[in-house]
């Protein structure tokens, strides 16, 4: 349990992140730029690159090294990105996405395989350049680097499209679907790599992961989607509004996010699929979507993107 001083430090950190993110997001919006640019830049300003270099004492006060406070902040930012992908999923037009599934798939394969092959080849032939340890398996290390280079920044892509009002467009959906397919492939490969590093059988692990993930997507987008479509009118009219429907969306989103995280695939994929399944319902009111959108994109999402900037230390990385 956090004591009084840790609670104070945590609240100061959150308040500072939200304040600077909002100010810089408004500046970017004024110049017709996506607000995410301001939010990430806010993290860079507040992080070790700027504030930490100019005023180490102030940086240590605003973002203390206390492990408990750090853990809580990491938990909040993880929750934030899960909620963001849930909201992104609500905006996806499933029928339009299915019509352009081939374009999304081929784009994803091209966009994933090129950086994977390049990263694998470089890491395999020049492992010292990537800091490979002497005891590391060269094949596993090269697979790891190739996979890391092939995974896109899905939350950043999604938020940028949302800020530019392109999320519901044809090109926006193809971009989102391509990034989603590519990242799914990347996380599945990561689960195989972890199996190769341990004592389990990578082949069995890969087959199980693909089977469970494929089953999850099919179940969520066919029978569960239909059940949700029938349940939403009841939730929006018979239970306290908007509390009832919001609780339902978040509970289902968090449970499915937990499931995909347990599979070894990132939690954001479970949340995104739930968002798609719920958002496809004709009964989900625009008011409900707007409440979710405003709540997540103005409170939680900025915390996640600021946290990205906070992890950047240009002086340390390029020294």
Where are these regions (language model features)?
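Membrane-interface junctions of multi-pass transporters
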Residues: 46-103, 233-241, 245-319
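Transmembrane alpha-helical segments of multi-pass membrane transport proteins and ion-pumping complexes
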Residues: 14-26, 44, 48, 52-53, ...
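Entry/N-cap segments of selected transmembrane alpha helices
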Residues: 6-22, 67-71, 92-127, 202-220, ...
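Juxtamembrane helix-boundary/capping and inter-helix hinge elements in multi-pass membrane proteins
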Residues: 33-34, 90-103, 127-137, 160-173, ...
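Transmembrane helix-loop junctions at the membrane interface of multipass transporters and ion channels
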Residues: 125-127, 184-204, 259-262, 310-319
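Transmembrane helix-bundle signature of multi-pass membrane transporters/permeases
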Residues: 40-45, 105-113, 144-152, 175-184, ...
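Short helical (or helix-break) motifs at transmembrane helix termini and adjacent helical loops
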Residues: 83, 91, 141, 145-189
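Structural signature of hydrophobic alpha-helical transmembrane segments
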Residues: 3-17, 68-85, 137-152, 208-220, ...
């Amino acid at each position: 349990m956090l004591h009084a001083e840790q609670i104070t430090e945590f609240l100061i950190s959150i308040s500072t992140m939200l304040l600077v993110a909002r100010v810089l997001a408004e500046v970017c919006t004024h110049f017709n730029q996506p607000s995410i640019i301001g939010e990430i830049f806010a993290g860079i300003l507040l992080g070790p690159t700027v504030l930490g270099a100019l005023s180490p004492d102030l940086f240590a006060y605003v973002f203390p090294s206390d492990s408990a406070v750090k853990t809580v902040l990491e938990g909040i930012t993880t929750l934030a990105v899960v909620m963001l992908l849930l909201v992104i999923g609500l905006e996806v037009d499933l029928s339009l996405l299915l019509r352009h599934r081939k374009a999304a798939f081929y784009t994803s394969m091209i966009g994933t395989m090129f950086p994977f092959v390049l990263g694998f080849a470089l890491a395999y032939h020049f492992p010292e350049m990537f800091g490979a340890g002497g005891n590391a398996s060269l094949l596993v290390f090269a697979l790891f680097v190739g996979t890391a280079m092939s995974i896109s920044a899905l939350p950043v892509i999604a938020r940028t499209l949302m800020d530019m009002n392109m999320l519901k467009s044809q090109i926006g959906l193809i971009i989102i679907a391509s990034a989603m397919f590519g990242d799914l492939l990347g996380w599945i490969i990561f689960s195989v790599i972890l199996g190769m590093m341990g004592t389990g059988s990578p082949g069995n692990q890969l087959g199980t992961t693909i089977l469970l993930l494929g089953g999850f997507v099919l179940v969520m987008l066919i029978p569960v989607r239909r059940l949700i479509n029938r349940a939403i009118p009841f939730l929006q009219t018979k239970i306290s509004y908007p509390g009832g429907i919001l609780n339902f969306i978040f509970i289902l989103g968090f449970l499915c996010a937990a499931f995909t995280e347990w599979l070894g695939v990132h939690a954001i994929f479970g949340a995104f699929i739930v968002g798609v399944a719920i958002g496809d319902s004709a009964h989900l009111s625009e008011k409900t979507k707007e409440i979710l959108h405003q709540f997540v994109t103005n409170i939680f999402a900025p915390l996640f993107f600021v946290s990205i900037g906070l992890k950047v230390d240009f002086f340390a990385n390029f020294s």
